[in-house]
Amino acid sequence: MAVIAFTQEMATLGSDVAQGVCEALGLEMVRHEVGDVVAGRMHVKKSLIRRLREGKAGPFEKWTADEKSISIFTAEEVLERAVKGNVLVRGWGATMILRSVSHVPCVRVCAPMDLRVTRLMKRLETDDEKLARHEIDVDDHARATRMSEHFGVHWGDPTLYDLTLNTERIPVATCVDMVVGLAKSAAFQETDASRRHLADLALRAHARAALKAN
């Protein structure tokens, strides 16, 4: 059962790549669903979790939010989804949470800043370059901060990923083919050992979440 951990920079066509991979492999795409579960476990509004993830929460929201709880419940949900299999998890630190599982390819999609700004301006139907660049900067900072605080790593470090795709040079369709090829390769086939390791990670995450909930 294929499992793919996927992350992307804003305005890189990463969502198109992820959708194409899911269609090609028959996978469920999981993104916002993780946040919905985390919000439920923490008894807070879904919008609060979303704003925190996007780096748009206000000072009071940041002060009241329990980042440790978010991290614990996120890991539990991501690992639970991975155990079920046939899933592509977008974001939520999945590339770090699942990195030690040998049958899970970790993929990152990126592109040069100027191209991302152009793409976002088109998406937002605006000619305000400053606005688009600010939105990207805020998103990049939020992602980088989460990865640093939760995992102690630099989000852009290429050694954290099995495959990094630059959509300035590689078309979406080719990106999809490359991810599908990686997932089907012998290097990323599930084994008894990798399945047991994933199950063990999930069990430990569930125990941590249960303790936190109580």
Question: What are the roles of these predicted feature ranges?
Answer:
Residues G35-N86, T126:
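ATP-dependent small-molecule kinase phosphotransfer cores
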Residues G91:
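Divalent-cation
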Residues V3-F6, P59-T64, L120, D162-T164, ...:
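Short hinge/gating elements
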Residues I4-V21:
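Glycine-rich phosphate-binding P-loop
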Residues S100-R123, K130-I136:
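Conserved phosphate-donor/acceptor-positioning beta-strand/loop module used by diverse small-molecule
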Residues G181-R204:
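N-terminal presequence-like segments and adjacent domain-start helices
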Residues D128-V172, A202, R208-A213:
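Small-molecule kinase domains that catalyze NTP-dependent phosphoryl transfer to phosphate-bearing small molecules
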